[in-house]
Design a protein with these regions (language model features):
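Short, surface-exposed beta-strand-loop junctions and turns on beta-sheet-rich folds
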Residues: 153-155, 178-180, 185-187
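A short glycine-threonine-serine/GTX helix/turn-capping micro-motif
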Residues: 91-98, 187-195
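Beta-strand-loop-alpha-helix segment that lines the small-molecule cofactor/substrate pocket
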Residues: 1-45
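Contiguous beta-strand/loop segments that form the cofactor/metal-binding neighborhood of enzyme cores
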Residues: 98, 104-176, 201-212
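Predominantly a Rossmann-like dinucleotide-binding segment in NAD(P)-dependent oxidoreductases
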Residues: 47-118, 125
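C-terminal helix-rich "cap/oligomerization" subdomain common to oxidoreductases
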Residues: 5-7, 203-235
Length: 235
């Protein structure tokens, strides 16, 4: 049976959020019994344009990946003073670095854990917040470099990944739901935002009832994503 309150199927667990920033030293053996199935939510992996990009990835061999998530924090929650929400306050777990963990989650899904990572972050805009509003990363993989830009102060919503390849660039625009190919062709994957969550739950229920081994996003991998998001190198 499914327990919607706990996100569980027959004793198997779907964690709805990532680990908190102070849990990077967590010993997972203390949290899960041996053989326990577990899956940490990663909704951007399940959106239509991401699935389309992932299908093409084996033949692309990109030299570089450029990732951006830029938006204006005061517009996140219409009718709510942005200065009062957790995002604005470091002590409440806010800051663009941890708020936008999904970018590192899908990068790890596409390319794995980088060999080396550098991260610079801080508060640079005139927003009335004490959390970081800008976080920039450079990551080195065996065959490519990745650039990641996260901010709270961009006017207009931009969320995309661009892959630079031998035949040109491929741009997956998550806001528009489109994939632009090197020849200018635009493929459309617009869909209701809830569709990604439906796909994710379909996977989880199937895994819980019939799957074996680790899930596609086990807690150990999610913990590594958290470490990368915080700018830590993962061995």
């Amino acid at each position: 049976p499914v327990d919607p309150g706990r996100g569980a199927v027959a004793g198997h667990f779907h964690r709805k959020a990532d680990f908190s920033a102070d849990q990077t030293g967590l010993d997972l053996a203390d949290c899960l019994p041996a053989g326990q199935k577990a899956y940490v939510a990663a909704p951007m992996r399940w959106c239509g344009v991401m699935l389309a990009l992932k299908d093409r990835l084996p033949g692309l061999h990109p030299y570089c990946a450029r990732v951006i998530c830029s938006s204006y924090l005061p517009d996140w929650r219409p009718g709510v003073d942005y200065r009062t929400v957790y995002s604005a306050h470091k002590a409440m777990g806010g800051g663009v670095t941890i708020d936008l963990i999904h970018e590192w989650d899908y990068l790890v899904e596409l390319f794995g854990v980088p060999e080396q990572l550098y991260n610079f972050k801080g508060t640079y805009s005139d927003l009335e917040i004490d959390s970081d509003d800008l976080s920039v990363y450079i990551a080195r993989y065996p065959t490519l470099l990745a650039e990641v830009h996260l901010d709270y102060f961009g006017r207009g919503y931009r969320r995309s990944i661009e892959l630079f390849c031998h035949d040109g660039s491929y741009l997956a625009d998550f806001g528009a739901g489109t994939l632009t190919l090197p020849d200018g062709t635009v493929q459309h994957y617009e869909e209701d935002v809830n569709r990604r969550y439906e796909r994710e739950m379909e996977y989880f229920v199937d895994y819980a009832l019939t799957g074996s081994g680790e899930s596609c996003n086990p807690p150990a991998l999610a913990l590594n994503v958290l470490k990368l998001t915080l700018g830590e190198n993962v061995q």
